[in-house]
Amino acid sequence: MFIDKAKIYLKAGKGGDGAVAFRREIYVPAGGPAGGDGGKGGNIIFQVDEGMRTLMDFRYQKHYSAENGEDGKNRNMYGKDGTDLVLKVPPGTIVREENTGEIIADLTGSEDQVVVARGGKGGKGNSHFKSSVRQAPRFAIAGERGQELTVVLELKLIADVGLVGFPNVGKSTLLSVVTSAKPKIANYHFTTLTPNLGVVRTKFGDSFVLADIPGLIEGAHEGTGLGHEFLRHVERTKLLIHVLDVAGLEGRDPLEDFEKINQELHLYNEKLAEKPQVVAANKTDIPGAEDNLEKLKAVLSERGIEVFPISAATSQGLDELLSYVSKRLKELEEIEALKADTAPKEEKVYKYEETEDKYHFTVTRENDVYIVEGRFIERLINSTNFDDIDSLSYFQKVLRNRGVIDRLKEAGISEGDLVKMYSVEFEYFN
């Protein structure tokens, strides 16, 4: 089955904690602090793999974590950085942030890669906190947590050629005949619910990827039927084969069908309607198809659209159709290559930023308890040794400098009131 959406949870590596250590070499009785910094947490990186065609792997594993950084060591030795986790995705994958729907990355090129979740910074060792009044600091800073987020992966199908047309016009039959793909085929609407891919090899040895894209009906641009799913898959094909039932077996006019589908493409995205098209006039082996075929040719030839009479059931006319499509693809690829050579090169860089300030915190009151929360508060709590006077002094200094004490006063705190910061509770005294 072709999977084109997946939701996964990402957790980048935590930074290693800074070390509390002291020089203990012989003949150095008061060597001072020597705690090294923690290593950086591993990033989570998405990288294009041209050999992949689906998001199937992400269906079975939903949680991904990068390696944590190592803690700092004695003798001012840094901890080792955590190893990055590289996740391979097919070309054409879009990464969205689940809550906002914001596009984080659009991975199309063969060498595209992007850091989606950044590892936390390593904490500072106690050697950073030595001063004229603090000769032997007994505290260090904990490493930062890595970024955590849930993302939705969406694969915009990358096929060279897409088969479009109303349900039951013979797209699935055509795909099964010209490729080794085995789509479900039956005589009812929306038999094809997900795209089927196949590789076409012409009699001249050329090849291209062909996709039988789920059928659509009027109102598809508004989401009717399989509309939005269908239209999303069309976007990145280079060329469309518009399959029409010229026998009119369901009582429809093939020319009207052609106009209706192109109208849906235009309403969804004007660029879709501008894609090069070739018409495969299917079911010409059925009596009565000839009149519709001549009418179709007369109208579309004036618009410069090639019409190929075929029968997917008997393989009539398929060689001519596929040879033309292969030739047209080469022309389009040459045009794209020329544009790429002349266009200014632009380096794609994505950096996932925190939505809130690094030192953001909140003060709330529940009954007689003042609760202070924030990422920097949590990190400060984790890195404070409350049994050490120097560490406690540094803790109080940070709260004062970052405005926490002022905010508590604004909230109405009084002498002796209880303050809670995660796992720590203490009474407030000015």
From Swiss-Prot:
<dbReference type="GO" id="GO:0005737">
    <property type="term" value="C:cytoplasm"/>
</dbReference>
<dbReference type="InterPro" id="IPR027417">
    <property type="entry name" value="P-loop_NTPase"/>
</dbReference>
<feature type="domain" description="OCT">
    <location>
        <begin position="351"/>
        <end position="430"/>
    </location>
</feature>
<keyword id="KW-0342">GTP-binding</keyword>
<dbReference type="GO" id="GO:0003924">
    <property type="term" value="F:GTPase activity"/>
</dbReference>
<dbReference type="InterPro" id="IPR006073">
    <property type="entry name" value="GTP-bd"/>
</dbReference>
<feature type="binding site">
    <location>
        <begin position="165"/>
        <end position="172"/>
    </location>
    <ligand>
        <name>GTP</name>
    </ligand>
</feature>
<dbReference type="GO" id="GO:0000287">
    <property type="term" value="F:magnesium ion binding"/>
</dbReference>
<comment type="function">
    <text>An essential GTPase which binds GTP, GDP and possibly (p)ppGpp with moderate affinity, with high nucleotide exchange rates and a fairly low GTP hydrolysis rate. Plays a role in control of the cell cycle, stress response, ribosome biogenesis and in those bacteria that undergo differentiation, in morphogenesis control.</text>
</comment>
<keyword id="KW-0479">Metal-binding</keyword>
<feature type="binding site">
    <location>
        <begin position="311"/>
        <end position="313"/>
    </location>
    <ligand>
        <name>GTP</name>
    </ligand>
</feature>
<feature type="domain" description="Obg">
    <location>
        <begin position="1"/>
        <end position="158"/>
    </location>
</feature>
<feature type="binding site">
    <location>
        <position position="192"/>
    </location>
    <ligand>
        <name>Mg(2+)</name>
    </ligand>
</feature>
<dbReference type="InterPro" id="IPR005225">
    <property type="entry name" value="Small_GTP-bd"/>
</dbReference>
<feature type="binding site">
    <location>
        <begin position="282"/>
        <end position="285"/>
    </location>
    <ligand>
        <name>GTP</name>
    </ligand>
</feature>
<feature type="binding site">
    <location>
        <position position="172"/>
    </location>
    <ligand>
        <name>Mg(2+)</name>
    </ligand>
</feature>
<feature type="binding site">
    <location>
        <begin position="212"/>
        <end position="215"/>
    </location>
    <ligand>
        <name>GTP</name>
    </ligand>
</feature>
<dbReference type="InterPro" id="IPR036726">
    <property type="entry name" value="GTP1_OBG_dom_sf"/>
</dbReference>
<dbReference type="GO" id="GO:0005525">
    <property type="term" value="F:GTP binding"/>
</dbReference>
<dbReference type="InterPro" id="IPR006074">
    <property type="entry name" value="GTP1-OBG_CS"/>
</dbReference>
<dbReference type="InterPro" id="IPR045086">
    <property type="entry name" value="OBG_GTPase"/>
</dbReference>
<dbReference type="InterPro" id="IPR031167">
    <property type="entry name" value="G_OBG"/>
</dbReference>
<dbReference type="InterPro" id="IPR015349">
    <property type="entry name" value="OCT_dom"/>
</dbReference>
<dbReference type="Pfam" id="PF01018">
    <property type="entry name" value="GTP1_OBG"/>
</dbReference>
<protein>
    <recommendedName>
        <fullName>GTPase Obg</fullName>
        <ecNumber>3.6.5.-</ecNumber>
    </recommendedName>
</protein>
<dbReference type="InterPro" id="IPR006169">
    <property type="entry name" value="GTP1_OBG_dom"/>
</dbReference>
<keyword id="KW-0963">Cytoplasm</keyword>
<dbReference type="InterPro" id="IPR036346">
    <property type="entry name" value="GTP-bd_prot_GTP1/OBG_C_sf"/>
</dbReference>
<keyword id="KW-0460">Magnesium</keyword>
<dbReference type="GO" id="GO:0042254">
    <property type="term" value="P:ribosome biogenesis"/>
</dbReference>
<comment type="similarity">
    <text>Belongs to the TRAFAC class OBG-HflX-like GTPase superfamily. OBG GTPase family.</text>
</comment>
<feature type="binding site">
    <location>
        <begin position="190"/>
        <end position="194"/>
    </location>
    <ligand>
        <name>GTP</name>
    </ligand>
</feature>
<dbReference type="InterPro" id="IPR014100">
    <property type="entry name" value="GTP-bd_Obg/CgtA"/>
</dbReference>
<feature type="domain" description="OBG-type G">
    <location>
        <begin position="159"/>
        <end position="330"/>
    </location>
</feature>
<dbReference type="Pfam" id="PF01926">
    <property type="entry name" value="MMR_HSR1"/>
</dbReference>
<keyword id="KW-0547">Nucleotide-binding</keyword>
<keyword id="KW-0378">Hydrolase</keyword>
<comment type="subunit">
    <text>Monomer.</text>
</comment>
<dbReference type="Pfam" id="PF09269">
    <property type="entry name" value="DUF1967"/>
</dbReference>
